[in-house]
Design a protein with these regions (language model features):
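N-terminal amphipathic/hydrophobic interface segments
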Residues: 1-402
């Protein structure tokens, strides 16, 4: 027999304030205003909180309930916390575990070594080997804040979000709504796709379901398939339409297999992946336009699923090993590897210069093959300090040789 202790057995019930506690047996310490409950422990607080476990140590003065062994805490029948050891502070309405635990809601399952849950605001804090499992993705972090009502995860440490065989998101600051899959990613976060596309920037708003991203500050978008990188201060991408643009200090770098990089600067740059369409290239009973520029063509064309299209507007400058160019706008068509320069285009290579109303640059194997000047075409070559060779015409072809 223990002094100052009441021993109760069989369908034991306690009431303290608005809380009911049930168990198989208990030690009640009346002077200390505390109890030890054993076997099928069940705590009920109002109509929102229920706690279960094998053992409960409850202090009526501090209102601290310590559950041990096979512990489960249920909030509003929507959120369930499962662990082996749980302390529930009724005074502050905070529950926390410290030897590994799990919180489940209607959408996600979260596990960690240490965790804290606040029923008042549905907010949870996880630390140590944190993992969030969603039907579509898995999130891993060292520390994570999560709201079981809004399903929003606040990223406060290095975090990896993986959509298997599809997309990986790396961030250390921001938020990710696991229900809508909308996110705000800060501090140079990175989005990687399985097809080789990547997106990074100081701040990224990303809608995973819509495949849409908007970047503010030091944007960098890499297209490994087309060997191309876009830079700028801000821009947007639409993954489903394979469309994107970048503006404010915009630059495009094309790094082809030929190892010759092409640099393009402009106020604004647009890139698109255009679907190929099978079509007849030789029409029957056609009338030829009176021009000297006639080239043989195949009967039909079906090369690949898509081709690259680039558009650059205002104050365009292009630099590569073979040639440099300036103009007001550029349109590049990857289907036939032709770049069309408009708005006072000027192209030069060493001592040679070509200008016209419109200049078309034809590429071959990643290098410049020849130029086609259309309208007021002029070619100039410097032969001496004050000597120049000049040639002018309505149209002109200028070939680039090594």
């Amino acid at each position: 027999r223990l002094p100052d202790v009441q021993i109760l057995k069989g369908n034991v019930r306690f009431r303290h304030d608005s809380v009911w506690m049930y168990c198989d047996s208990a030690y009640f310490f009346e002077k200390q205003n505390s109890l030890h409950a054993f076997g099928h422990v069940h705590l009920v607080q109002g109509d929102s909180i229920e706690g279960f476990g094998d053992i409960l140590y409850y202090n009526g003065n501090t209102k601290l309930a310590r559950f041990r062994n096979h512990v489960k805490l249920i909030h509003n029948e929507a959120t369930t916390l499962t662990t082996d050891s749980l302390d529930y502070d009724r005074m502050r309405n905070i529950a926390y575990y410290f030897s590994g635990g799990m919180i489940e809601d209607s959408l996600n399952t979260l596990t960690s070594l240490w965790g804290q849950y606040t029923p008042d605001d549905n907010q949870a804090l996880f630390k140590g080997e944190v993992q969030l499992e969603h039907p579509k993705f898995v999130l891993n972090a060292d520390t994570l804040c999560y709201n079981t009502e809004s399903y929003q995860a606040d990223l406060v440490s290095k975090t990896r979000i993986v959509y298997e065989h599809e997309t990986t998101i790396l961030s250390s600051n921001g938020w990710y709504n696991t229900q809508t899959e909308h996110s705000m990613l800060l501090d140079r976060s990175l989005i990687l796709h399985a097809d080789g596309m990547t997106l990074t920037g100081d701040t990224i708003y990303y809608d995973k379901q819509a495949g849409y991203g908007k970047v503010y500050g030091n944007m960098q978008s890499v297209d490994s398939t087309n060997h191309m990188t876009l830079y700028g201060d801000k821009g947007e991408v639409w993954e489903s339409d394979n469309h994107g643009y970048v503006t404010d200090s915009a630059m495009l770098v094309e790094w082809s297999d030929s190892l010759m990089n092409i640099y393009m600067h402009a106020d604004t740059l647009f890139t698109d992946q255009i679907p190929y369409q099978r079509c007849d290239l030789i029409a029957k009973d056609s009338v030829l336009v009176d021009t000297v520029w006639q080239y043989p063509a195949p009967d039909t064309m079906w090369v690949d699923t898509t081709y690259l299209q680039i558009r650059a507007y205002y104050n365009v400058r292009v630099f590569c090993e073979d040639m440099q160019s300036v103009c007001d706008s550029v349109h590049y068509n990857g289907r036939d590897s032709v770049a069309t320069l408009c708005g006072n285009p000027v192209c030069w290579s060493e001592d040679n210069q070509v200008s016209a109303d419109t200049v078309k640059i034809y590429l071959k194997n990643g290098t410049v093959d020849y130029l086609h000047g259309i309208g007021n075409a002029i070619a100039v070559k410097q032969e001496g300090e004050r000597e120049f060779d000049q040639m002018a015409g309505k149209e002109m072809l200028a070939y680039v040789q090594d």
